[in-house]
């Protein structure tokens, strides 16, 4: 019993000791940063996954499923390909003299005129697309001795047989087809594009019926180039009731140059020229609908916002677009390292500083103070250090966007079958570029995240050191981001520490006196906890012993009977 009384006395003495921050002559001031219950994982140079309070997604991985008609001028090809619109297919007459920033070709587009081929289809398509216009100027060519404006039932304009509106099909007049020699100088100050063709009859009889000669020849020349085409007579697969074909060619005539056309048959002559423009217009294959909205960046999937530096929607883009990368997600840290707050603070509910954990619920700043003094507890943010961190983090996203956004469009790459090896090489180069950009993007984001975390940690340390320099010997660093202040420090005193007007000399004598008095009797918190738990355990043990002794004594006296049945 004496032991029990002694342990109880020790327990009471321990509880009676003044705890840091609980007495009238001391106070506790802790520094900390805000935290959230569930942070965001980001990647840094040193860590694959580190939790931060805030992060911004840098990869745009979905489109609007529609193409915006602003600020770019979009021309919907509908049922027409760009080449059909160029040649003047009857069902594409609405496209004459049209202009565009982006010509959108649809999968439903079809040709509905004389069957033709373009030996270098992709180059012509790209040339017209980049010009951004179908502006056409008619010219008076002198085709003496032949019949003009040939037509076909395979190319109807309304109920009548017709032909491509930008081409002039020449055939014999009477029973003659003389040698044609026509010149057309370019006296203007811009490039002129002439489209012409060669007719390939399906039989020798068709050849002589149209052109008299058994074999024709077409030569088109400028000072810089010459093309000579001999028709290839023979049957081909039937298309719209015809087994003959037309091959389409083009010639660019520079200012001061001259166009010369020589032919003794099979010529599909130009009616004029297309005025060439230089610009950043382009063409894209897409079935996304065109709608009234605004977006700088367009992909075949639809328009996408360009407020992120990277995108994973499509390699092919037009406009000011995010850089294409392989990653579906890259997160940029825009907050500090997140250490969720511990819900329990030990047996006495003490406050803790940033070294132990962050503080949830601190919404008015990133860094701040918590205190316990004779007037109670309180919390306030430190706006200066918060603003210093925010100022350095703000603009990170914009700087990354500036470094990575495409200023030009990434066009479709197409090659003919003859250029298969070039196509393979181009694909390899494009894939390598994407791999490099994907790696660079990941490295760039990891570096920025490392910098953000280091700088936010640095601001916390700066605030802690600033507070330490103010308090000097008037307080003791408790090792957890808190200071034990050895003098009476009311709310006004705490506020002076926060705003940097604290005068340590004013409290120096009181602090030294209290420090010596408290140190003389204070048990270190670690030993105090041990004594508390040990005394509690022994007290419980002795209580059990006393209770068991009482039961045995009662059994001996007959006051308690215990029956054991088997």
From Swiss-Prot:
Where in the sequence does glycosylation occur per the annotation? 24, 38, 54, 61, 79, 142, 181, 301, 499
Protein keywords: Clathrin- and caveolin-independent endocytosis of virus by host, Clathrin-mediated endocytosis of virus by host, Disulfide bond, Fusion of virus membrane with host endosomal membrane, Fusion of virus membrane with host membrane, Glycoprotein, Hemagglutinin, Host cell membrane, Host membrane, Host-virus interaction, Lipoprotein, Membrane, Palmitate, Signal, Transmembrane, Transmembrane helix, Viral attachment to host cell, Viral envelope protein, Viral penetration into host cytoplasm, Virion, Virus endocytosis by host, Virus entry into host cell
Q: Name one GO molecular function term.
A: host cell surface receptor binding
Residues linked to a lipid group, S-palmitoyl cysteine type: 555, 562, 565
- GO CC, one annotated term: membrane
Q: Which residues lie on this side of the membrane: Cytoplasmic?
A: 552-566
Chain segments annotated as coiled-coil in the UniProt record: none
The places in or outside the cell where this protein is found are: Virion membrane; Host apical cell membrane
Record field: transmembrane: 531-551
What is known about its processing and modification? Palmitoylated. In natural infection, inactive HA is matured into HA1 and HA2 outside the cell by one or more trypsin-like, arginine-specific endoprotease secreted by the bronchial epithelial cells. One identified protease that may be involved in this process is secreted in lungs by club cells.
What topology does it adopt in the membrane?
A: Single-pass type I membrane protein
Please list the residue ranges that the record places on the Extracellular side of the membrane: 17-530
Q: Which GO terms describe its biological process?
A: clathrin-dependent endocytosis of virus by host cell; fusion of virus membrane with host endosome membrane; fusion of virus membrane with host plasma membrane; viral budding from plasma membrane; virion attachment to host cell
Intrachain disulfide bonds:
30-482, 68-293, 80-92, 113-155, 297-321, 489-493
Cross-referenced Pfam families: Hemagglutinin (PF00509)
Q: Which Gene3D superfamilies match?
A: 3.90.20.10, 3.90.209.20
Q: What does this protein do?
A: Binds to sialic acid-containing receptors on the cell surface, bringing about the attachment of the virus particle to the cell. This attachment induces virion internalization of about two third of the virus particles through clathrin-dependent endocytosis and about one third through a clathrin- and caveolin-independent pathway. Plays a major role in the determination of host range restriction and virulence. Class I viral fusion protein. Binds to sialic acid-containing receptors on the cell surface, bringing about the attachment of the virus particle to the cell. This attachment induces virion internalization either through clathrin-dependent endocytosis or through clathrin- and caveolin-independent pathway. Plays a major role in the determination of host range restriction and virulence. Class I viral fusion protein. Responsible for penetration of the virus into the cell cytoplasm by mediating the fusion of the membrane of the endocytosed virus particle with the endosomal membrane.
Summarize subunit and interaction data from the UniProt record for this chain.
Homotrimer of disulfide-linked HA1-HA2.
Print the miscellaneous field.
Answer: Major glycoprotein, comprises over 80% of the envelope proteins present in virus particle.
UniProt lists the family membership as follows: Belongs to the influenza viruses hemagglutinin family.
HAMAP family xrefs: INFV_HEMA (MF_04072)
**Name of protein:** Hemagglutinin
């Amino acid at each position: 019993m004496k032991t029990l009384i002694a342990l109880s006395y020790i327990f009471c003495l321990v509880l009676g000791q003044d705890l840091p921050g609980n007495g009238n002559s001391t106070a506790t001031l802790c520094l900390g940063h805000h935290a959230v219950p569930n942070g965001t994982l980001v990647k840094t140079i040193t860590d694959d996954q580190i939790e931060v309070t805030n992060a911004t997604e840098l990869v745009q991985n979905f489109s609007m499923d529609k193409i915006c008609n602003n600020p770019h001028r979009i021309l919907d090809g509908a049922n027409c390909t760009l080449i059909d619109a160029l040649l003047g297919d009857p069902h594409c007459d609405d496209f004459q003299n049209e202009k565009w920033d982006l010509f959108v070709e649809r999968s439903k587009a079809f040709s509905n005129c004389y069957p033709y081929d373009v030996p270098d289809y992709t180059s012509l398509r790209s040339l017209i697309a980049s010009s951004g216009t179908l502006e056409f100027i008619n010219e008076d060519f002198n085709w003496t001795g032949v019949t003009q404006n040939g037509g076909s039932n395979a190319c109807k304009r309304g109920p009548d047989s017709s032909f491509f509106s930008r081409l002039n099909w020449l055939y014999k007049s009477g029973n003659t087809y003389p040698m044609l020699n026509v010149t057309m100088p370019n006296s203007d100050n811009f490039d002129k594009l002439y489209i012409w063709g060669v007719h390939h009859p399906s039989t020798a009889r068709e050849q002589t019926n149209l052109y008299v000669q058994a074999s024709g020849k077409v030569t088109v020349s400028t000072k810089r180039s010459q093309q000579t085409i001999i028709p290839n007579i023979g049957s081909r697969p039937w298309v719209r009731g015809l087994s003959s074909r037309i091959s389409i060619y083009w010639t660019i005539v520079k200012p001061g140059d001259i166009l010369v056309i020589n032919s003794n048959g099979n010529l599909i002559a130009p009616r004029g020229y297309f005025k060439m423009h230089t610009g950043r217009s382009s063409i894209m294959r897409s079935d996304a609908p065109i709608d009234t909205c605004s977006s700088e960046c367009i992909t075949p999937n639809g328009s996408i916002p360009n407020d992120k530096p990277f995108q994973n929607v499509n390699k092919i883009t037009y406009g000011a677009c995010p850089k294409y990368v392989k990653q579906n997600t890259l997160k940029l840290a825009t907050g500090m390292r997140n250490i969720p707050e511990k819900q329990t603070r030990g047996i006495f509910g003490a406050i803790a500083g940033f070294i132990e954990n962050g503080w949830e619920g601190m919404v008015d700043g990133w860094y701040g103070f918590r205190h316990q003094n004779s007037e109670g507890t309180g919390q306030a943010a430190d706006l200066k250090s918060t603003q210093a961190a925010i100022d350095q983090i703000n603009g990170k996203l914009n700087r990354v966007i500036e470094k990575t956004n495409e200023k030009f469009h990434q066009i479709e790459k197409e090659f003919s079958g003859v250029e298969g090896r070039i196509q393979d090489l181009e694909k390899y180069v494009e894939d390598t570029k994407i791999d490099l950009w994907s790696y660079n993007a990941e490295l760039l984001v990891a570096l920025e995240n490392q910098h953000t975390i280091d700088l936010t940690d640095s601001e916390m340390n700066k605030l802690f050191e600033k507070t330490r320099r103010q308090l000097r010997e008037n307080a003791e660093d408790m090792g957890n981001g808190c200071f034990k202040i050895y003098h009476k420090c009311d709310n006004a005193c705490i506020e002076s520490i926060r705003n940097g007007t604290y005068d340590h000399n004013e409290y120096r004598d009181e602090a030294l006196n209290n420090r010596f008095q408290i140190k003389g009797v204070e048990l270190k918190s670690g030993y105090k906890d041990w004594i508390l738990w040990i005394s509690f355990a022994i007290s419980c043990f002795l209580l059990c012993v006393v209770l068991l002794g009482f039961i045995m004594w009662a059994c001996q006296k007959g006051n308690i009977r215990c029956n054991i049945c088997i």
